[in-house]
Amino acid sequence: MANIGFYAGSFSPVTRGHLGIVCEALNDYQKVIVGVGINDSKQQLYSLDERCEMINAALDDLLFEYEYRDLVGYRFSRSEEKAVCRLRENRGCVEIVGYRDLTVDCALRSGA
């Protein structure tokens, strides 16, 4: 059985802090599922699809920044370096799923 972590949020928008948590989770789990929730009681700036795309783009940016870290001047922590290496080897170690039901139901469906 795979060791799967689940990280839920609205990610409206995704931040550097969110990516830091994903990186930390990648050091503890074989796979990390990022659950993007829909909360009807909150006014969302971006649609579910846009938020999922933003997370993918942020992960791409993280890989790019790591590749060119000497040029961009961003310092990576050891856990970020480890996580980026995992992402470069296997982008499938992070899966992004949208959901509108209970977080626990999405986590269970995802195998976390």
Language-model features, listed with the residues they occupy:
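Nucleotidyltransferase catalytic core that binds NTPs
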Residues: 1-112
